[in-house]
Amino acid sequence: MPIASSISSGPAPEPGFGSQIKALADGFAAEPAWANYLQAREAVLRMMDDWARLGPEEGPSTYWRQEMGGFDYLFDASPLVIGRLREHCHHLTGVKSFDYRPHHAHLKADFVRKYGVLLAAGGEDLFVPEPLALGGFGFDVGPGLANIDTLKFFEVLIGLRKAGALQDFQAPDGPRRTVVEIGGGWGGFAHQFKTLCPNSAYVCVDLPPTLLFSIVYLKTLFPEARTLVYGEPGFEAKLGEMEPYDFVFLPPWRLPRMEQARIDLAINMVSFQEMTTAQVEGYASVLRALGCPALYSLNRDRSKHNAELSTVSEALGRHYQLTQIEVLDEPYTQIAERKRPRELAVTGYRHLFGRA
């Protein structure tokens, strides 16, 4: 038998690795996430131009220029990168998929323990697992995947319920309410909140490079959602009627001019602690001036190495009457059980709820 004939009559060869990668990338390029990324990138680039034109006090700081240098490659990403967007969110929270791979399965029991502690704290119906979409990751704690971010968001939802701030948002027949998250990151908490409170308008306020993550993530997870992004055609007129929108994406300098919008609740997680006293007080002052009646904070009162902040509670307390909400006697970062609970000092995490 001729050699050529014997080769052709055998089973088809497996495609090479390069062909497999190309097929995977082509598949991601046909997914909605890629189209969402292309639109989000153009919007964020316009925001970046506006940001650069602001004065030195409002424009990008040296710190944020350095931080953005860690993920500026996302402005020239491929479909394969966007299809695994969650792999790259560690630039914002430090949570990496590597720590949840099978060779770390021995850590799963600690996450199951922490999930149980949160359930006992009053979160029976508030857990929203990490979605698999866009490369989601975590350990299976029973009802789904969870990582440190997932459990942090779960803890804040429990705190909001304990503060009496969540119930009105969950009412299906009540008026549509608006929540503003200062520093929404990659959009993980927005996903959980909107899943539990679909009759709400969610405003993500963050620095332009970070909005690249949240716009893509939330538009992909909620394909039917009505979204409004700073700078799009007719943006100013549309913002005056914010209630029809599910998600609104704003840079910080646009927040003070939301006079026409009704804001029912503002939330911040672990970024007030990294700001200066003037910046934290500035946000509280703006929210108060806009008529926001309630503010929720999960932050260290002051990060150990932040010499430019007095305390978060002092800065917020000038504009809101604060109450500490007791959720757990351990910080959200503690997953494994400790025999003795850690003492809560000025550098410990505190759940604070403020009323105007």
Map each language-model feature to its residues.
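Conserved SAM-dependent methyltransferase scaffold
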Residues: L157, A190-H191, L211
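Rossmann-like AdoMet/SAM-dependent catalytic core
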Residues: I3-P79, P252, E314-A356
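Conserved class I S-adenosyl-L-methionine
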Residues: D173-G185
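S-adenosyl-L-methionine
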Residues: Y217-E259
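Conserved SAM-binding loop of SAM-dependent methyltransferases across substrates and taxa
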Residues: W186-C197
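Conserved beta-strand signature within the Rossmann-like core of class I S-adenosyl-L-methionine
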Residues: A289-R302
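Conserved Class I S-adenosyl-L-methionine-dependent methyltransferase catalytic core
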Residues: D49-P172
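A short, conserved alpha-helix within the catalytic core of class I
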Residues: E274-L287
